[in-house]
């Protein structure tokens, strides 16, 4: 018989840097999950990723306080900031442009994010990423 699910916890955890401090500790502690067990397992699984890369993680907590987790690809904004070399997006989206990004760069990001996006093909995924770039205050150029 399958284990009964107690709940889900969604966190954005830096790759290879899970520690019992907030926000991880309190979120897992409320559900009675072994915090150090999660941190060790997460850090072991994300060894190959670049240290500090934010990874959206969904933790499934079962009634017997055991857990499983799934990591997803880093957020589109992380890839966009890396491609353009930004620290943060525009504070005045639509009025202030902070940089430029090419369609080729958008397509490359879309290919990396494809499995986590709700899109049927790379073109649709690129349009989703383009929307994120525009909302960060970036100008999309053809070259």
UniProtKB/Swiss-Prot annotation:
Record carries keyword Ribosomal protein: yes
Single biological process term from Gene Ontology: translation
The keyword Ribosomal protein is annotated on this UniProt entry: yes
Record PTM: One or more lysine residues are methylated.
PROSITE patterns membership: RIBOSOMAL_L11 (PS00359)
TM region(s), chain numbering: none
GO molecular function: large ribosomal subunit rRNA binding; structural constituent of ribosome
Matches recorded under Pfam families: Ribosomal_L11, Ribosomal_L11_N
Keyword annotations of the record: Methylation, Ribonucleoprotein, Ribosomal protein, RNA-binding, rRNA-binding
Subunit structure: Part of the ribosomal stalk of the 50S ribosomal subunit. Interacts with L10 and the large rRNA to form the base of the stalk. L10 forms an elongated spine to which L12 dimers bind in a sequential fashion forming a multimeric L10(L12)X complex.
Family statement: Belongs to the universal ribosomal protein uL11 family.
Protein role: Forms part of the ribosomal stalk which helps the ribosome interact with GTP-bound translation factors.
Protein name: Large ribosomal subunit protein uL11
Name of the gene this protein is made from: rplK
């Amino acid at each position: 018989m399958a284990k009964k699910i107690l709940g889900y916890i969604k966190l954005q955890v830096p790759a290879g840097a899970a520690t019992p401090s907030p926000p991880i500790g309190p979120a897992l502690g409320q559900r009675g999950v072994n915090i150090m067990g999660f941190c060790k397992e997460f850090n072991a699984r994300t060894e190959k990723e670049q240290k500090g890369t934010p990874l959206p993680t969904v933790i499934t907590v079962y009634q017997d306080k055991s857990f499983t987790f799934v990591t997803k690809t880093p957020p589109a904004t992380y890839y966009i900031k890396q491609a353009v070399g930004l620290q943060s997006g525009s504070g005045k989206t639509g009025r202030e442009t902070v940089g430029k990004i090419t369609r080729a760069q958008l397509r490359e990001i879309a290919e990396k994010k494809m499995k986590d996006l709700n899109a049927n093909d790379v073109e649709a995924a690129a349009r989703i990423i383009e929307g994120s770039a525009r909302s960060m205050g970036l100008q999309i150029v053809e070259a």
